[in-house]
Each structure stands twice: as structure tokens, then as C-alpha cells.
Amino acid sequence: MVQSLLNDITYEDQLTTVEGNMFQMIYGISEEEVEEYAAYVSTGATAEEITVIKAKDEATAKSIKEKLSERVKAQKSSFESYIPKEVEKIDNAIVYQEGVYVILSISNDSEKAETIITGK
């Protein structure tokens, strides 16, 4: 799924991998809460972002979903004064949970991202 989100959606900016301490700093999620994850953020001045997380269990996944929703709110607050044109992307962000999987996608094409994420 991560590769589909990276390859099948056109991004304005290059996305870079987020790992280790940076992952915890950006999302407030410790590596102990997750079994595996892939996270990518914009290298420049866009809000574009992809995060796919496999949580330890469904309760943790629910908590992670809340943290990703908080990330979206923080990004909106930050970009409103910084680069207002990015707010539309943030307003259309997808934060999705299915079982132990939690996904965040911020892009120009939220419809396509949602199709990739949900399979619908």
C-alpha cells in the first residue's frame, strides 16, 4: 500500500523517509507501540505526508489514530499562517484505521488515496 500511495499519486514535492527518534518526535508515537511502520514527509514546504502503521493491537491502533488526527490539526494550524494554500490538502487528509493498521495520507488527490487505502 505504501508503494501505491508513493507511486500512484502525484506529489508536488519529494517525500523523505521518517525513522527512529524523528518518527517519535513528529507523531508522538513510540516504537514500542508499533510492530512496523513506514512514514514519509515532504522535504520542502508542502503538507504532503504518508504514514502507514501496524500497531501492537487494536486498542493501541485506536490511540495511534487519535495521535495522527492530532498531527493533522497541528499541521493545519502551522500551515494556515505559513503556506495557506496547503490547508486544502490538510482539510482533505485521510486518517483511517482497519484493525491494527492506521494510515495517514495528505496529498492533492485524496480521492485516489482513499481508493488505494480502502480498496473502494
Regions found by a protein language model. Name each.
Residues 1-120:
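Soluble, non-membrane globular domain cores that form compact, hydrophobic packing
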